[in-house]
Amino acid sequence: VGYKFGLEFLNSKNGRNFISKLKKKIIFADLKINDIPNTCVSTIKAIKDLKVNYLTIHISSGFKAIKAAKKIAGKTKLIGVTVLTSLDNKALKEIGFNKDVKKIVLDQARLANKAKLDAIVCSAQEVKIVKKVFKKEIITPGIRFNSKINDQIRTLTPKQAYKNGSDWLVIGRPITKGNIKKNMQTLIDHLSQ
């Protein structure tokens, strides 16, 4: 179990201070860095003092950017983010991509492998194809217990994700929205069926 913090938390009034006080915890900084190589490197240098265990970067930043980021990351595991789980083929076409989402994810997984990234983030729906070209950790967001998918599109249940080969599951709102204790029990019940 680890703690995942996004840009909104890190940039909040007390976010950085809170993260700096966490000791002996797995810290996953989900910043989804997406910029030119120099800015990606500068961003990683700017948060080195937080000693995060995992840090995300968009593979769409390009090979030079992710390779430079990996070089400067040190002990921090650099995680390549593929296509966001809130996007499907229609949404990708709207922003100028003509390839199928699975083809894009597969191409990005190959690039992550070439840059020697430590892990990759992709939808649980793509894990099986990603495993063919990327042999390290695979982290899957968009995990849902039921049909309430919020703004996620490419979703699966925890059991389906593990069956497909996911190493780590990111489960946010299904746990944090509403009664957390009850939601955790729902997760436990789901996994024990």
Please place each PLM-identified region on the residue numbering.
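Conserved, mostly hydrophobic/aromatic
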Residues: 3, 32, 55, 112, ...
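Conserved alpha/beta-domain cores
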Residues: 1-20, 31, 37-40, 124, ...
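Glycine-rich phosphate-binding active-site loops on the catalytic face of alpha/beta enzymes
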Residues: 54-65, 145, 154-158, 162-183
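Conserved anion-binding
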Residues: 35, 39-119, 123-128, 135, ...
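Glycine-rich beta-strand-to-loop/alpha-helix junction loops that act as flexible
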Residues: 5-7, 141, 171-174
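Catalytic-site microenvironment of enzymes
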Residues: 50, 71, 182, 186-193
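Acidic (Asp/Glu)-rich catalytic clusters
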Residues: 16-24, 46-49, 68-74, 131-132, ...
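Short glycine-rich, acidic/polar surface loops and turns
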Residues: 126-130, 151-160
